[in-house]
Curated annotation (Swiss-Prot):
Family membership noted in the UniProt record: Belongs to the peptidase M54 family.
Entry annotated with the keyword Zinc: yes
E.C. number: 3.4.-.-
This protein's name: Archaemetzincin-2
Active site annotation, chain numbering: E255 (proton acceptor)
Biological function: Probable zinc metalloprotease.
The species this protein was found in: Mus musculus (Mouse)
Keywords: Hydrolase, Metal-binding, Metalloprotease, Protease, Zinc
Cofactor needs: Zn(2+)
Residues annotated as binding Zn(2+) 1: H254, H258, H264
């Protein structure tokens, strides 16, 4: 394992900038907000840790990228920020998200609430669900994993065409696996920053995807026609566990972060780190580092302690059931408890941040 540890000077410059105007902006922040963000360059911080690289297959090793500091983010003339006329994050579900209508609806509410807390100050709305056939996307059976996949480029085109006028962005979510081109095995998600659209799949976040017990396998023989979407009827949907909900929240906020102009983080352990595989994605924290937090705050304009309190409230609202998973059928509960036990460590982290902000 390799630990990527930057110097105090490097991290401080990445956060504050060398530009006197941006430094002055930073110095005008609330004292508590400065205290929290200054943790970025504290060697013994117990809130923000260095990035660890565990193998050559990790993102940083296999996808070399130039880092983006706050000044580069702020001065990016191609970056799009929310404005009064375009200030809503729209989420479009594609295909069923749960095994019943009730489960799908509750899952959507949980994701909406999380996004509203994470991007505190922006509105989040869900569009009416659409079927795979309505997108007219290409699809295939993955020759390695034998599961159905839909084409990201075609989905992005569909989303762009149906993007509401007041949308800052529109993101599609699905429980069906994705592929961007024939030569690729899969992709967790894909976004177009210039168009403000993205598509993300949670198919691989189920507990059985990488096991022999996975129930979503099909054969190429079942594909009667490249336009026969009936193969998606009653297609396997993973159970909404607490871990799947956490992974979904991570992916959704990571990708919307990209649409807001945040590139992959290479400063500290951060939600905005790139990930090549599920194990690496699971290592990423739910929180953004101080450098990326300043970027988000600059783009949206939230009060940090209010944002953290909103995230704690999302976790606390509706305690989860003991099993940490949604019921198998809608008849078990008319109103499903939110499975949040996987978020408990993060809640403790948020409370430590709030204490520091209010010190």
């Amino acid at each position: 394992m390799q630990v990527l540890r930057h110097s105090e000077h490097t991290l401080k410059t990445a956060l504050l900038s060398k530009n006197p105007v941006l430094v002055s902006q930073y110095e005008k922040l609330d004292a508590g907000e400065q205290r929290l963000m200054n943790e970025a360059f504290q060697p013994r911080s117990n809130l923000f840790e260095p990035i660890t690289v565990h193998s050559q297959s990790d993102w940083i090793s296999s996808h070399p990228e130039a880092p983006q500091d706050f000044e580069q983010f702020f001065s990016d003339r191609y970056r799009k920020a929310p404005c009064p006329k375009k200030h809503i994050i729209y989420i479009q579900s594609i295909g069923s998200l749960g095994n019943t209508r009730v489960i799908s609806e509750e899952y959507i509410k949980w994701l909406k609430g999380y996004c509203e807390a994470f991007f505190y100050g922006l509105k989040v709305k869900f569009l009416e669900p659409v079927s795979v056939s309505e997108t007219k996307c290409s699809f295939r059976v993955n020759e390695h994993t034998q599961n159905l996949q839909i084409h990201t480029g075609h989905i992005l085109a569909f989303l762009k065409k149906n993007k509401p006028e007041d949308a800052f962005c529109i993101v599609g979510i699905t429980m069906i696996d994705l592929y961007p081109r024939d030569s690729w095995n899969f992709v967790f998600g894909q976004a177009s920053l210039s168009s403000g659209v993205g598509i993300f799949s949670f198919a691989r976040y189920g507990k059985d995807f990488y096991t022999s017990k996975y129930e979503g396998n099909v054969t190429s023989l079942q594909l009667t026609s490249p336009t026969d979407y009936s193969i998606f009827d009653n297609y396997y949907i993973p159970e909404i566990t607490s871990v799947l909900l956490l992974r979904s929240c991570k992916t959704l906020t990571h990708e919307i972060g990209h649409i807001l102009g945040l590139r992959h983080c290479q400063w500290l352990a951060c939600l905005m780190q790139g990930s090549n595989h599920l194990e690496e994605s699971d290592r990423r924290p739910l929180n953004v580092c101080p450098i990326c937090l300043r970027k988000l705050q600059s783009a949206i304009g939230f009060n940090i302690v209010e944002r953290y309190r909103a995230l704690v409230k999302w976790i606390d609202d509706e305690s989860c059931n003991e099993s940490g998973a949604t019921p198998k059928s809608s008849s078990e509960h008319a109103h499903l408890p939110k499975p949040v036990e996987a978020f408990k460590d993060w809640r403790e982290w948020l409370m430590r941040c709030i204490a520091l902000l209010e010190k």
